[in-house]
Every structure is written in structure tokens, then in C-alpha cells.
């Protein structure tokens, strides 16, 4: 009986060790989307481009230990480059104004208004879980468990759900994936 107990204790210690190791792959909590084939974002005139290739985030890439302990999730979807149109707020629907900053505990967003008083929301694909990480997790260096949990969410789920809602004839939002470069209209939100 003691041998079985020791065996399970050793297995538990190994599992905890592997879990802790798997959380040490990054110390970042939030990372902006990555532009593909653009080395210096400040040297690019995005007004000359109609679209760019962007990966939502490479923050969730994992080695085999991390995949074993925390799962495959949607890691490939987060790091796969997609072609998205470039959007400027001064030309969107004849120009929009920023009403206020929004966002819950995970996303960064801006509430926009068109000249026709139509309200829009500009929301980041990337999640920022900083507010969700408990202090004890930060103290123990385990914040990556919370951060990595985001890899279980598909980065483009809102687009897929809207399409399904359309087929089901259910009222829904109409999300579009765009790239918003630095611009005068964004002012201090750049």
C-alpha cells in the first residue's frame, strides 16, 4: 500500500514539475499582433497599402511539454498569418469620431460614431488578461497559466458566430477583421 502511495506522490510531483515548466515559456502577458514581412512598422506608409498580412499573436506558441500539459488549443489559429484590409478612421463611413474608450477585462476597444450617428466598436483581437491574474499566481510565477488559457479561445470566433447567426436568422453583430495603423484620428490611443 505504501508503494502505491509513494508512486502516486512521485507522479503528482512530476506532473506539478512539468506543469510549472510548461508555464515558464514566456513572461509576457500581452503582445500586439505581429505584422508579417514588415520589419520596421514606423517606416511603412500604410496609406499605400490596401491590406497587410498579420498574425493575431505568437504568444501562445508551445513546445511539446506545454502542449502535453496545457493542450493544443487554437495555437495555430492565433499564429497563422491572415490578410486583412487596412482601415483609417477618417475615411471609414465618411469619417468617424472616437466617443470613448471601452473594453472589459480582456480586450482593448474604442466606441466610435459615424456622421450619421451610427455607433461602432473597434475591438482588439488580442486579449489582455492582466486584470484576471490573481496576485498569488504572479507571486508564484504562474501567470502564464491564465495567459495561456486564452489560446483555448479562437481568435476569429466572433466572425464565425456572426455567420452562423445569419444563417439561423438571429439578430447579430457584423464583425470585420481589419488592421488599424497609427493615425492622427487615434490621437493618444495609437
Sequence positions of predicted segments:
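Conserved ATP-binding subdomain of kinase catalytic cores across diverse folds
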Residues: 85-190
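Regulatory N- and C-terminal appendages and interdomain linkers associated
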Residues: 2-99, 127
Amino acid at each position: 500500500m505504501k508503494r502505491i502511495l509513494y508512486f502516486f506522490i512521485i507522479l503528482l510531483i512530476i506532473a506539478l514539475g512539468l506543469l510549472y515548466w510548461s508555464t515558464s515559456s514566456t513572461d509576457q502577458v500581452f503582445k500586439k499582433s505581429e505584422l508579417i514581412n514588415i520589419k520596421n512598422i514606423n517606416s511603412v506608409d500604410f496609406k499605400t497599402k490596401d491590406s497587410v498580412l498579420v498574425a493575431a499573436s505568437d504568444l501562445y506558441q508551445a513546445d511539446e511539454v506545454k502542449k502535453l500539459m496545457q493542450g493544443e488549443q487554437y495555437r495555430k489559429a492565433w499564429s497563422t498569418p491572415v490578410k486583412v484590409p487596412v482601415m483609417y478612421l477618417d475615411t471609414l463611413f465618411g469619417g468617424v469620431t472616437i466617443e470613448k474608450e471601452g473594453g472589459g477585462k480582456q480586450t482593448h476597444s474604442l466606441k466610435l460614431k459615424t456622421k450619421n450617428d451610427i455607433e461602432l466598436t473597434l475591438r482588439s483581437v488580442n486579449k489582455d488578461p492582466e486584470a484576471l491574474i490573481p496576485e498569488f499566481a504572479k507571486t508564484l510565477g504562474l501567470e502564464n497559466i491564465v495567459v495561456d488559457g486564452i489560446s483555448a479561445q479562437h481568435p476569429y470566433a466572433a466572425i464565425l458566430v456572426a455567420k452562423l447567426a445569419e444563417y439561423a436568422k438571429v439578430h447579430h453583430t457584423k464583425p470585420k477583421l481589419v488592421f488599424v495603423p497609427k493615425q492622427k484620428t487615434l490621437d493618444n490611443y495609437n
